[in-house]
Amino acid sequence: MNEVKFLSVKLAEKLDLSAIASVFNVTRTVKWQEVLLIDHELVELVLKRPVEKREVYLYSFGVATFVDFTEAEIRDFLAFIAQIQTVNYDDFAMYYDHYEAVVGDYGEWIVTPTLTIPFRPMIKHIAEAVAKSTGFMHTEAHLNRVMDSVEPMITKLAAGRSRITKTTMRIVRETIVFKFKLTRNLKLFERPSDAEFDNISREGYDWLSNHFELDERYQINAQKIETLKRMVYQYYHFNQNRKVRSLYIFEVFLLMLFPLVRMLSDRLPLMLAWLLRS
């Protein structure tokens, strides 16, 4: 019996899987697939030493899952990836998750004392579950920060206690961009279709999903994104109302100005005559 360690880390906002695949000379049969497997033979080429059962799963949403790597091996692999695209080491240090799979002498994953599943077919599913947990961690933190910035601004606008400044516009612009990124990435975190599993592997993935609370976190993030959308709509609503109100005030000003202009125009000849006599 032994433990196989899965470590997922956030490397970038988005990983360019096509660029990485071309460096490794890996043919991606389906370009839109959101995961790229670097098997142990390719890992050996990067680390320049023999390694057993090391694999890396790279996901387009910027997360990598290392299977049974040591810390030194992870550092060496990241140094190689950094030559292909920028690695955000700040995110790497902040957003990560892990899981240790207990594997029996006959190659079975001992999920619980009453549930065992063949380990090898489940590796990709375990890697995906840990990667999604890490991705959620990053999304949750950024989503909370954005909402903390936007909510007070919307409240002040609603109360008429805030002007639409360059800072306000910048926050809203960043919020809109972030909202679209979240909406796109959240689709990648959706539950896999039943076609990807047989009955046994489905049971294993269900256990992983419960362990990392993936379904609950997906729903919470989806609800927060909807709240963020409503906040942006409120901003446009208040902004539009403010423009309409400004036009109304200007219209009232013009209506008040017309009688004055007419009065002055009627008396203008008399005023000119008086000035000339003076």
Model-identified regions with their sequence ranges:
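Membrane-associated alpha-helical segments
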Residues: 159-258, 262, 266-272
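Membrane-interfacial helical/loop segments at transmembrane boundaries in membrane proteins
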Residues: 272-278
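Generic structural signal of hydrophobic/aromatic residues within well-ordered alpha-helices
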Residues: 20, 24, 77, 81, ...
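Short secondary-structure junctions and interdomain/linker hinges
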Residues: 27, 84-88, 146, 150-153, ...
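Hydrophobic side chains in well-ordered alpha-helices
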Residues: 20, 76-80, 135, 139-142, ...
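Membrane-proximal low-complexity regions enriched in glycine and acidic/polar residues
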Residues: 116-184
